[in-house]
Amino acid sequence: MEHYISLLVKSIFIENMALSFFLGMCTFLAVSKKVKTSFGLGVAVVVVLTIAVPVNNLVYNLVLKENALVEGVDLSFLNFITFIGVIAALVQILEMVLDRFFPPLYNALGIFLPLITVNCAIFGGVSFMVQRDYNFAESIVYGFGSGVGWMLAIVALAGIREKMKYSDVPPGLRGLGITFITVGLMALGFMSFSGVQL
């Protein structure tokens, strides 16, 4: 149990997808103008990562890994295309389930669900899971923790950007300029976790 808690803390803070690996930056910067929309996208990313990482773990270990299907057959060259296909399928299934059973939540998320398909933080989580050879339980914890870490980062950035509306920002830095500086300072803050050994 202690191993899973340390993996969760590690994936949220020490190896934060957005602020340590800088994955998912397109949506991270584009959607972080308001806390409400950032939170909605963050929840969707948590759900997709929590499902996509373990499902791709099963696909990799049961189909793609060397000697998984047949002795002497290695399908690991199909990793990228298979993982992207599984992520896209999961996002479509999630979109249909939300549309059918939770219409208010589906309408609130709107365009954010299809955007998750191309969010490289999702693919990064799956790739790290394979690279680090996590088992199924570890992949669930890692997927959830990575999603929570990404959501924490985007909600924090959105809160800072909302407060910066009332600040006197120099004209040359308004918009993305000050946002990049803010993200850099946030990443420096998260670097302090890199010394923590779990």
Swiss-Prot record:
Q: Which GO terms describe its cellular component?
A: Gram-negative-bacterium-type cell wall; plasma membrane
Location of the protein in the cell: Cell inner membrane
Return the InterPro entries for the record. Answer: NqrDE/RnfAE, NqrDE/RnfAE_oxidrdctase, NqrE
Q: How does it sit in the membrane?
A: Multi-pass membrane protein
Organism equals: Vibrio campbellii (strain ATCC BAA-1116)
| Keyword Transferase appears in the UniProt entry | no
Question: How far does the signal peptide extend, from start to end residue?
Answer: none
What are the recorded GO MF terms, alphabetically?
Answer: oxidoreductase activity, acting on NAD(P)H, quinone or similar compound as acceptor
Catalyzed reactions per annotation: a ubiquinone + n Na(+)(in) + NADH + H(+) = a ubiquinol + n Na(+)(out) + NAD(+)
Q: What class of enzyme is it?
A: translocase
Q: What family is reported?
A: Belongs to the NqrDE/RnfAE family.
Protein name as it appears in the record: Na(+)-translocating NADH-quinone reductase subunit E
Q: Which UniProt keywords are given for this protein, alphabetically ordered?
A: Cell inner membrane, Cell membrane, Ion transport, Membrane, NAD, Sodium, Sodium transport, Translocase, Transmembrane, Transmembrane helix, Transport, Ubiquinone
Give TM regions.
Answer: 11-31, 39-59, 77-97, 110-130, 140-160, 176-196
- Enzyme Commission code: 7.2.1.1
Query: What gene name is listed for this protein?
Result: nqrE
Q: What does the protein in this record do?
A: NQR complex catalyzes the reduction of ubiquinone-1 to ubiquinol by two successive reactions, coupled with the transport of Na(+) ions from the cytoplasm to the periplasm. NqrA to NqrE are probably involved in the second step, the conversion of ubisemiquinone to ubiquinol.
Q: What does the subunit section of this Swiss-Prot or TrEMBL entry state?
A: Composed of six subunits; NqrA, NqrB, NqrC, NqrD, NqrE and NqrF.
What is the first-listed, main subcellular location in coarse terms? Answer: membrane
